[in-house]
Amino acid sequence: MGPKKQKRELPEDFDPVYPYDVPQLQINPPFVSGDGFNQSVDGVLSLHIAPPLVFDNTRALTLAFGGGLQLSGKQLVVATEGSGLTTNPDGKLVLKVKSPITLTAEGISLSLGPGLSNSETGLSLQVTAPLQFQGNALTLPLAAGLQNTDGGMGVKLGSGLTTDNSQAVTVQVGNGLQLNGEGQLTVPATAPLVSGSAGISFNYSSNDFVLDNDSLSLRPKAISVTPPLQSTEDTISLNYSNDFSVDNGALTLAPTFKPYTLWTGASPTANVILTNTTTPNGTFFLCLTRVGGLVLGSFALKSSIDLTSMTKKVNFIFDGAGRLQSDSTYKGRFGFRSNDSVIEPTAAGLSPAWLMPSTFIYPRNTSGSSLTSFVYINQTYVHVDIKVNTLSTNGYSLEFNFQNMSFSAPFSTSYGTFCYVPRRTTHRPRHGPFSLRERRHLFQLLQQ
């Protein structure tokens, strides 16, 4: 047996009588016009539209319009909400203008006032001299004596000119000049000077003075003087002894002697070695001055390194002529004083031996000849032992021993002082006690 055939389902409205299909009912209107309507092949009637008519989302017929148009009260009108636009009573779109812009039948124009002109290239400014255009900018060229500043145009002032409180230009007046009530520059004069139209003149008594070849001189006449004044030819002078001298036009009491001074200079550089190095790292100041039968000394030490608690020594070793030797720990200059400078003994024509310590009072190469002094470092007392002639067998020496030196660099000592008896020389013999003048001068040196 073959496969069993299934029964095909039939629609409920199936009519077994031929024809089997239900005929479609077509109903046509009694008339169709071709104006505005369109009928498709299948008989569908529709509207025939063209832009700007369109169907919206609800399939309703509407009008499509672009920018510049809007619906107002179910009417299509021109949108005038943009700046500078409006509609006239005729409903036409026009521009809104404001002075100096004007609107005419020909178009928009600009009302021009004085100083402006219009050309094919555009609006321009009318200028006349001295105004001019430079770099598309209006400028005012300036003549000599004028200048442009942030505050505006002003006067360029040269030397000797200024402005007063009223901003007027005036002359700067220095010493010896003045402006009179008429604004004229004059030279004030006080007696015996006289200022006139011819210039400055000198008012003098013709009885006492005479003008000869533009030079004013004292009229010669007999003048009697009494000592100590003296008259020689046309000059009156003071007669004084060798105990006085004239210094800068003043009579002063002159000492009968001039002290010798050997020193390191007022501001020496590093000149002593304080540690085990080959380069000086300390500065020592020493000044020796012979006054009569004594040598007065002052000294000070400055260090650029830290020092530990130990004795620091600075020595000066001299030969038999008083010249500083190279084996001294002091390595700087040491010579005679000339104002604030140091000069060599040969240049000064002086003998440094005259300031050397006496070998009779301070024997050579012994340890017993010493002096005592002291200095302060940061308010700390430091004892200084000064040994004399202890380092030389045929010359002289001074050795400064600073005790318990433990200070942080940099530091400077105060000035210490001492004195000793110098050797006797034939260069400057000295006998007997100090005179009154010498004692006064010695006191002045001790006060310095």
Swiss-Prot record:
Q: Its induction, per UniProt?
A: Expressed in the late phase of the viral replicative cycle.
- Localization: Virion; Host nucleus
- What is the documented function of this protein? Forms spikes that protrude from each vertex of the icosahedral capsid. Interacts with host receptor to provide virion initial attachment to target cell. Fiber proteins are shed during virus entry, when virus is still at the cell surface.
Give GO terms for biological process.
Answer: adhesion receptor-mediated virion attachment to host cell; cell adhesion; symbiont entry into host cell
Record protein name field: Fiber protein
Q: What else is known?
A: All late proteins expressed from the major late promoter are produced by alternative splicing and alternative polyadenylation of the same gene giving rise to non-overlapping ORFs. A leader sequence is present in the N-terminus of all these mRNAs and is recognized by the viral shutoff protein to provide expression although conventional translation via ribosome scanning from the cap has been shut off in the host cell.
- The superkingdom listed in its UniProt entry is Viruses
Where does the signal sequence lie?
none
Free-text comment on this protein's domains from its UniProt entry:
The tail region anchors the fiber to penton base capsomers, whereas the shaft, built from several repeated motifs, allows the knob to protrude from the virion.
Q: Which family would the database say this protein is a member of?
A: Belongs to the adenoviridae fiber family.
> What do we know about how this protein assembles, alone or with others?
Homotrimer. Interacts (via N-terminal tail region) with pentons.
Keyword set, alphabetical order: Capsid protein, Host nucleus, Host-virus interaction, Late protein, Viral attachment to host adhesion receptor, Viral attachment to host cell, Virion, Virus entry into host cell
GO (cellular component) term, any one:
viral capsid
Kindly report the protein's main subcellular placement as a broad class: virion
